[in-house]
Every structure is written in C-alpha cells, then in structure tokens.
C-alpha cells in the first residue's frame, strides 16, 4: 500500500487540475492563436505561468485505485499489476483470460 499522504496529494492535484482546466485552456488558446498580437500572447503566457504548478495535468501520476501503487499501472483497468492479476485470477474482469499457447 502506498502512503495515504501520497494518495491524498495526488487527489488534491487532480482537484486542482479540474479547477483550473477552463482557465488554462483559454490561455493556451490565446497563446496558440495566430490572430492574437505578440503582446496578447506574451501576457497570456505570463498569466499561464502564474497559475499553480499542480494545475498542469502532466504533473499527475496514475495510481492503482485499490493500493495506490504508482508503478505497474494499467490504464485500461485502473489497477496496478498485482491487483490486476488477482482480479483476473478471481474472474472479476469480464473477457480477460490467462494467456496460454
């Protein structure tokens, strides 16, 4: 199990990302716009830099929903490799069968 503080920190990051998503998107649209003047782009870039670092989605880390483990994460299932294996062996994931050849 991952430390509770790390899992909570990640939840807080996700919350911050959601809170600032619209603002970040608007500023990025101005920065990438060909119609905006150089001054407008520069000001938008400064505003984007003033936003909290944790509002950037790339700072997030995928974690297992059950254990909070950050490594060995399978996006399709939202589980770490250990819990994915357990769930597969118990038949809890429909359509997933152990490979055999």
UniProtKB/Swiss-Prot annotation:
One of its GO terms (molecular function) is rRNA binding. InterPro entries: Ribosomal_uS14, Ribosomal_uS14_bac/plastid. Keywords: Ribonucleoprotein, Ribosomal protein, RNA-binding, rRNA-binding. One of its GO terms (biological process) is translation. Transmembrane segments: none annotated. It holds the Pfam family Ribosomal_S14. One of its GO terms (cellular component) is small ribosomal subunit. SUPFAM superfamilies: Glucocorticoid receptor-like (DNA-binding domain). Binds 16S rRNA, required for the assembly of 30S particles and may also be responsible for determining the conformation of the 16S rRNA at the A site. Belongs to the universal ribosomal protein uS14 family. PANTHER family: 30S RIBOSOMAL PROTEIN S14, SMALL RIBOSOMAL SUBUNIT PROTEIN US14M. Part of the 30S ribosomal subunit. Contacts proteins S3 and S10. This is Small ribosomal subunit protein uS14. It comes from Alkalilimnicola ehrlichii (strain ATCC BAA-1101 / DSM 17681 / MLHE-1). The lineage of its organism: Bacteria, Pseudomonadati, Pseudomonadota, Gammaproteobacteria, Chromatiales. The gene is rpsN.
